[in-house]
Amino acid sequence: MRQLIIARKDLQMSPGKLAAQCCHASLAFLTDPIGMGQGVEPIEEDGEITGYRAEIILDKATYEEWFDGSFTKTICGAKNRNQLLKAKTIAEELGLVENNDFFLIRDACHTELEPEEFDENGEGMTLTCIGFRPLPDEIARQISRKFHLY
């Protein structure tokens, strides 16, 4: 079992930006559900919210083979946006679901990247990576075989 992350090479991100984007991609399968409030409860003391408790449910294989194992990750490079989106297409053809099995990571363009697209509020962003939840090795290989290691 391994986690696959594919990052764009054409953006020429600095090492720090690349690391940050890959970290976002690595954690998205955990942070996106929490950020949407799934399994989150407030912790109260004396009527005041002092924190939050988040429940994360992992399938048996993910826990036993990845969390309780080696946290194996493979980082590949995509030549450009179109090649990165090919990974999305391959994943969907394999039955994987966006925002559950894989996550498209977009930078908010506050530092070194220029926006490629804009959301409904006019906020600029650039697609940088695709991150997958931990996958069986054979599925990760089917997606990554079209890409080189970063």
Residue ranges and their predicted role:
Residues 1-150:
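Positively charged, small/polar-rich N-terminal and surface patches that mediate targeting and assembly
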